[in-house]
Design a protein with these regions (language model features):
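Glycine-rich phosphate/pyrophosphate-binding loop at beta-loop-alpha junctions
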Residues: 1-75, 120-139
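Active-site-adjacent helical/loop segments in soluble small-molecule enzymes
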Residues: 65-128
């Protein structure tokens, strides 16, 4: 689960994950207000979304993917999910309780786990799944 703004970190994760055919599945995590990777994946082409709505995840509030990142996203991203500021705030609290000091962008991946509960799971997670949460912002 990779926090995604313009897509450069996501591109790096996808490039690594796709070295072998049995690499991990990769999920882009974005603010619901600026989910350009998810929208682009669904459209099959780069889509710019308005990023003029305030969000606590300022570092992910981009609205447009880099052209170079799009190629890796198009060819390798399994799914994307948008998270709200409220979900991210709860994730920050949970991470803090577990001894991890994170800001909103860093907690977005943890928020995605909770957001996926009760929804159709694009990643097909099970009891034996290993999940890697990438945190891009500590405090």
């Amino acid at each position: 689960m990779v926090p995604t703004g313009v897509g450069s970190l996501l591109q790096a994760a996808l490039t690594h994950a796709r070295v072998s055919d049995d690499g991990p599945r990769v999920l882009a995590v974005e603010p619901v207000t600026a989910a350009c990777a998810t929208a682009s994946l669904a459209a099959g082409e780069p889509v710019a979304v308005p990023a003029d709505v305030a969000t606590s995840m300022a570092g992910l509030n981009c609205g447009t993917l880099s052209d170079l990142a799009w190629l890796a996203i198009r060819d390798g991203l399994d799914a994307g999910i948008g998270v709200t500021d409220e979900e991210t705030a709860r994730a920050i609290e949970q991470l803090e309780a577990d001894g991890v000091r994170s800001g909103p962008c860093g907690a977005a991946s943890a928020a995605a786990i909770t957001a996926m509960l009760g929804c159709p799971d694009p990643m097909e997670l099970g009891a034996d799944s290993r999940i890697v949460l990438v945190s891009t912002e500590g405090r």
